Amino acid sequence: MEDKKFKKLREINRKKNYFFKRLRFNVAKVFIDKWKRNEFYSVDIKKILFLRDDNKIGDMIVSTPVFKALSQHGFELHVLSGYSNYCVIESNPYIDKFYFYPDETKEIVKLGLKLKKEKYDLVIDMGEQLPVIYLLFIRLINAKNVFGFNKEKINIYNKNLKYSQYESHITERYKILMKNIGIYAYNMQYDIHVPKNIQDEVFDLYADLPGEITVVINPFAAEERRNISKEQLIGIISHISKLRPSVNIILVGHLDKLNTLPYLSECIINPFGSFLSAVEIIRQADLVISPDTSIVHVAAAYEKNTIALYGNDKHGNFVNNHVWGPGNKNAIQLVQKKENSKISEIPLDVILEQINFFLNKLGK
């Protein structure tokens, strides 16, 4: 009875917070937004700012084929990044300039005024959320054109597309973007660039491994409830070691978390620690196991054999398992039936069955 009462109170509180948030936004919009929507001109576009400052690594990975296509079609491309997802593009040759989105309001305003001097022909915003400060930021940039999705009530976005493909893969949204810019010849394969020195370090690591098959496991995700449990991880590693004792097992992810796993003596922890070293380790691997969509997308970039572990979540109306699915012909996606369930609730024997399938397929 008490649980139901608290659940009801939380629901009321959420609705109240949402109401006041919308009220604050609508009041601010009166002063910040344009009074009318300008006409969208695609023919004169030469310089583009792509907003990818949400700090989500997976979103940045999915954006990389668009960066490549825009550059190859002659556009000058600048990218606004977060500090956490910049690692994906730090060696990307198709981006002419990078900027970082700051945390403090004062610095956000200063950056907006700085970007105004770039005189952008187009700003691309692939995001769903639009806080008041971000509305002001885009207004300050004062680009000729601003492209967005589901921003029909905001006049700054003079090219708005209503998007309600709640079960379509995220790449479908990018295809719509490309069509509206007038680009039809492009490849949506994810495009991650690893510097030569990191490639050489990982090559040396693999050269010292005893086995011919390498399985890469990423135990952790951005949210704790999406982590592989201790019991699952021990079960997976033990099963692989017994089934194929010669298989190399490498763990990738945040070193501070990986170093808290003293029970994994049969594994190699990525000794380099960086995101791009994990990318290169995955590129050379035979099988990847991960609950984290960013690592699943890295594996997809190289069409690696993948066991992708998903809960059953919704982000608004969007079905996460479909929108952020592997998009990889060599991936098997294991999804919980119960909504908002934990990865730890996926039965171990279901995971082991797929490991058996891939190891038999590799057959070395």
Which residue stretches match the model-derived regions?
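Positively charged, low-complexity intrinsically disordered leader regions
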Residues: E2-I45
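Active-site donor-nucleotide binding/catalytic segment of nucleotide-sugar enzymes
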Residues: K47-D53, H193, N197-L258, N312-K314
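Conserved nucleotide-diphosphate donor binding/catalytic pocket of glycan-assembly enzymes
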Residues: E2-R10, Y99-D191, N218-P219, E223, ...
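Nucleotide-sugar donor-binding patch of glycosyltransferase catalytic domains
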Residues: D3-K5, F149, A300-K364
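Short amphipathic alpha-helix
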Residues: M60-L70, S84-N85, I236
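Donor-binding and catalytic core of enzymes assembling or modifying cell-surface/extracellular glycoconjugates
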Residues: V109, K230-N312
